[in-house]
């Protein structure tokens, strides 16, 4: 039935892609689409907002050679010396030997450089939050970076915590909420009222930070 239909707005386009069972008539499908106009418009506006945010990020990166990581603005420069590369207090140095590198290759090097630094940087922030919140029901054992498509983080009963590497681009309040959320799972493995009470105790006003975090695009870089 039409419950199996899903809709996906085409990026940078006014088109709408609708997939539906072959047993459904065109008239029935069009009627269903018309009944979903409010939902479609809401999703379209949200998509356009994300595109504007992403566009601003890349314009800043390529025109001013600047990037903000963990709330700190840093200049981005290129070096042909490998040992000079890395993320530092006021700059990001990329090891690039070929001056004619493509934009896509440049971004690949940027991502690789940031990820290498982000593992330790995000782990240190997360473990600082842990120290403020403990003790927990389940022991914390290991920290991982993730590139998941839909989730900012996760925590298992084995004590494995995963945080999306894109977290380096969000604000301190958003990171505090994310760390609190995943750390709270070391005591409450579900999203029960007790879980959210625990989150609120350690991250007052978390709802605003959660809303902003989930309005962002995961994996845009």
Question: Could you say what each language-model-derived stretch is?
Answer:
Residues 1:
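Glycine-rich phosphate-binding loop
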Residues 4-177, 186-221:
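Active-site-proximal or metal-binding-adjacent scaffold patches in catalytic folds
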Residues 182:
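Walker B catalytic acidic pair
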């Amino acid at each position: 039935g039409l419950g199996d239909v899903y809709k996906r707005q085409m990026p940078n386009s006014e088109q709408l892609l609708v997939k539906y069972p072959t047993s459904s008539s065109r008239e029935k499908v069009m009627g269903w689409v018309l009944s979903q106009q409010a939902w479609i418009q809401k999703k379209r506006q949200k998509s356009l907002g994300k595109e504007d945010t992403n566009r601003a990020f890349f314009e800043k990166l390529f025109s001013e050679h600047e990037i903000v990581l963990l709330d700190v603005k840093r200049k981005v420069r290129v070096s042909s010396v490998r040992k000079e590369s890395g993320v530092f207090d006021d700059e990001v140095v990329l090891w690039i030997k070929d001056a004619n590198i493509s934009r896509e290759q440049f971004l690949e090097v940027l991502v690789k450089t940031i990820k290498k630094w982000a593992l330790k940087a995000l782990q240190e922030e997360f473990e600082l939050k842990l120290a403020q919140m403990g003790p927990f029901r389940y022991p914390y054992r290991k920290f991982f970076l993730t590139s998941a498509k839909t989730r900012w983080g996760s925590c298992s009963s084995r004590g494995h915590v995963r945080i999306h590497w894109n977290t380096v681009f969000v604000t301190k309040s958003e990171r505090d909420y994310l760390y609190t959320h995943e750390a709270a799972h070391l005591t409450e493995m579900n999203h029960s009222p007790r879980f959210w009470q625990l989150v609120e105790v350690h991250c007052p006003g978390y709802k605003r930070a959660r809303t902003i975090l989930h309005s962002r695009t995961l994996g845009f870089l």
